[in-house]
């Protein structure tokens, strides 16, 4: 892995030791968490610069602090690159996270207790799309659409039926564990019929959208698009808001600052700008294409080994596996813990119509972006499929698992990070 920290040292030995251990873990693991990735050396370096010293409340040329002339240029570059990448008219690059980007949209477009409609959390939605545990469900009246019980995909006729029944002010699309292409145009038609705003949260698929490998919600006339800047976009941890509507961007800018945040994280915004430039390169499209190839191949391979893939296949970077299809006594928690013992890192995940709790689950979520960054192609994912099946089949044999772990470490070390 090129992201070595051998030349990095801090006096705080306790923290330094943990950083070194985490570096070792990343080097020696196969990371299949769909929301994680490995940033480039440039993105990593920029986050550790003196830009972290500068407070810059406000927006370029409208700051509340002096000394922002270079900071202004950095933020303007980030905005220009974001709008070019996603073919948008306006962008706000200040949100600290995807959740805060979503919160800003809610503040900008809604009043407390307005109705919102999103995919249920148990079917692949996100906490910020109306969960009662989250601000989106506490301060707004949230309703949900689900997936078709037979196809495990979105039933657009059912979404329309619910929308007519509740008349939401905001309809939300974009998900955290949905493996099919999203028909943004159908959502736009539904939103028009009930006079609702349409928000697309593309946090997971933003890299695919930017590369033209997934439909763009702005082309389908979504009112606003939110995203994280990590995941498939392969930038720093952070948020992003896009729109083609000047009135909406003015409201969003006020909702981000002063509505929800104070000073922006300029070292992160600079890293976002670097990541956007990387994503504008033709190599990024090749990378996204390989993500898709790997995901489709990976899902098919596990299917051949007897694992049920939710909705039968994937059309993006991730998919869900029903682990009970292999053994009714299995749970997502149990399988994710077993795989962790052999350095294969996944997350447990609820599946549609799951009877297990979110802390236990009947499924696991698998994604290909991180290991595709490391250089994995179909041959490597064939080996990963074998490793997963072997670990699950021999989960009670500690000697077998220890030997398998060494194979995983060897494969992982053969693909150091090269960007």
UniProtKB/Swiss-Prot annotation:
Recorded catalytic activity of this chain's protein: (6R)-5,10-methylene-5,6,7,8-tetrahydrofolate + glycine + H2O = (6S)-5,6,7,8-tetrahydrofolate + L-serine
Protein's cellular compartments: Cytoplasm
Pfam families: SHMT
Molecular function per GO: glycine hydroxymethyltransferase activity; pyridoxal phosphate binding
Known EC number: 2.1.2.1
Top EC class for this record: transferase
Residues at the site labelled Plays an important role in substrate specificity: 230
InterPro entries, sorted: PyrdxlP-dep_Trfase (IPR015424), PyrdxlP-dep_Trfase_major (IPR015421), PyrdxlP-dep_Trfase_small (IPR015422), Ser_HO-MeTrfase (IPR001085), Ser_HO-MeTrfase-like (IPR049943), Ser_HO-MeTrfase_PLP_BS (IPR019798), SHMT-like_dom (IPR039429)
UniProt entry keywords in alphabetical sequence: Amino-acid biosynthesis, Cytoplasm, One-carbon metabolism, Pyridoxal phosphate, Transferase
Gene3D superfamilies for the chain: Aspartate Aminotransferase, domain 1 (3.90.1150.10), Type I PLP-dependent aspartate aminotransferase-like (Major domain) (3.40.640.10)
Its job: Catalyzes the reversible interconversion of serine and glycine with tetrahydrofolate (THF) serving as the one-carbon carrier. This reaction serves as the major source of one-carbon groups required for the biosynthesis of purines, thymidylate, methionine, and other important biomolecules. Also exhibits THF-independent aldolase activity toward beta-hydroxyamino acids, producing glycine and aldehydes, via a retro-aldol mechanism.
HAMAP family: SHMT (MF_00051)
Name of this protein: Serine hydroxymethyltransferase
Organism: Phytoplasma mali (strain AT)
Lineage of source species: Bacteria, Bacillati, Mycoplasmatota, Mollicutes, Acholeplasmatales
């Amino acid at each position: 892995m090129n992201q070595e920290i051998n030349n990095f040292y801090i006096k705080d030995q306790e923290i330094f030791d943990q950083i070194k251990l985490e570096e070792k873990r990343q080097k020696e693991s196969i990371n299949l968490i769909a929301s994680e990735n490995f940033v480039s050396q440039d993105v990593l370096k920029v986050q550790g610069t003196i830009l972290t010293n500068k407070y810059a409340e406000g927006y370029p040329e409208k700051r509340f602090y002096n000394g922002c002339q270079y900071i202004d240029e950095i933020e303007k570059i980030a905005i220009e690159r974001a709008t070019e990448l996603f073919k948008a008219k306006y962008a706000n690059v200040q949100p600290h996270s995807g959740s805060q980007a979503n919160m800003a949209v809610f503040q900008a477009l809604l009043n407390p207790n307005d109705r919102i409609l999103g995919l249920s959390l148990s079917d692949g939605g996100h906490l910020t799309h109306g969960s009662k545990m989250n601000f989106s469900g506490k301060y707004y009246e949230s309703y949900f659409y689900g997936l078709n019980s037979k196809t495990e995909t979105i039933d657009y006729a059912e979404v329309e039926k619910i929308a007519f029944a509740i008349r939401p002010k905001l309809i939300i699309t974009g998900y955290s564990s949905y493996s099919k292409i999203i028909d943004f145009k159908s959502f736009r038609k539904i939103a028009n019929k009930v006079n609702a705003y349409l928000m697309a949260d593309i946090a997971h698929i933003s890299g695919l959208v930017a590369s033209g490998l997934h439909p763009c919600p702005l082309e389908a006339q979504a009112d606003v698009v939110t995203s994280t800047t990590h995941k498939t976009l392969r930038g720093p941890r952070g948020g992003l808001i896009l729109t083609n509507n000047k009135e909406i961007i003015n409201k969003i800018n006020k909702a981000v600052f002063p509505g929800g945040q104070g000073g922006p994280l300029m070292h992160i915004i600079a890293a976002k700008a670097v990541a956007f430039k990387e994503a504008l390169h033709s190599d990024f499209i090749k990378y996204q294409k390989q993500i898709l190839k790997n995901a489709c191949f990976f899902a098919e391979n596990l299917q051949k080994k007897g694992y049920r893939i939710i909705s039968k296949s994937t059309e993006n970077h991730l998919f869900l596996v029903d682990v009970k299809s292999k053994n009714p006594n299995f749970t997502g928690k149990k399988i994710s813990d077993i795989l962790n013992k052999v350095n294969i890192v996944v997350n447990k995940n609820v599946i549609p119509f799951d009877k297990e709790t979110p802390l236990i689950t009947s499924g696991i979520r698998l994604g290909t972006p991180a290991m595709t960054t490391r250089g994995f192609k179909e041959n490597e994912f064939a080996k990963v499929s074998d490793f997963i099946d072997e670990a699950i089949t021999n989960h009670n044999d500690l000697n077998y698992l220890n030997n398998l772990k060494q194979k995983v470490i060897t494969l992982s070390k053969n693909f150091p990070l090269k960007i």
